[in-house]
Amino acid sequence: MTTTERPPPPPLSMSKKETPTLLDSISKKISTTETLQRLRNKNLTTLNKIKYDSELLLHYLYDDHHNKNSDYANNNINVIKISKVKVKKTGASILAHYFAQIHVSTGYSFEFHPGSQPRTFQTIHTDGLIIKVLILCDECCKKELRDYIKGENSFNVAFRNCESILCRRVSFQTVLLTCAILLLLFNVEKFSMINLLIILLILLSLFCHNNYIISNPYIEFCNHKSTNKKYDR
């Protein structure tokens, strides 16, 4: 009868040393991947919401331009175009996203998208349906931008969304969706075809409002401009 000799198992000290090293390398890879995903995916950054400083933004837009640009004093005109575009990712074309194209008197131009962190500030590239145009002096434009940043820092989808921040009104989308949700909850308790029909009509009206009911944009001047009127076009 022959016996085979098996090699002795590796010492425990070696396995204990190799295991932490392997775990460390895996954890580093996972943390790196999560960091990259957090930077690329705006939905993950909502956990760490960015708080913008309006005064810092105004400093970069306006400060030191009085001395550098000789035509600055004669170019005290700021243009803000508020537009809306269909939401493509969620809700198909039932929902609409509101944004502003801002052209500052110092020559800077950018887009402001409330609730789109970390892409709140973007270059001019979006074509949307213009709702209104604001013609403002520097001081009024600064006040408007401060209000935009304040609204962005307190953004929420229900009561402080992009429509309420830019258009200074109660969100029409929020009102209709709230009514539809309340009727749906009531319909769960006590089913009624009438409530179901009303819900469908609400969704249809929201779809028509964001796609087919197109109102003419209007131009609004601030109080410090020579023309202080609203013009429809």
From Swiss-Prot:
Protein name as catalogued: Protein AC81
Entry keyword Membrane: yes
Keyword set, alphabetical order: Host membrane, Host nucleus, Membrane, Transmembrane, Transmembrane helix, Virion
Summary of the function given for this chain in its UniProt record: Plays an essential role in the assembly of nucleocapsids with envelopes.
Main location class: host cell
Membrane recorded as keyword: yes
InterPro entries cross-referenced by the UniProt entry: AcMNPV_AC81
Transmembrane segments: 171-191, 194-214
Alphabetized Pfam families for the sequence: Ac81
Lipid bilayer topology: Multi-pass membrane protein
GO (cellular component) term, any one: virion component
Classification lineage: Viruses, Viruses incertae sedis, Naldaviricetes, Lefavirales, Baculoviridae
Source organism, top-level taxon: Viruses
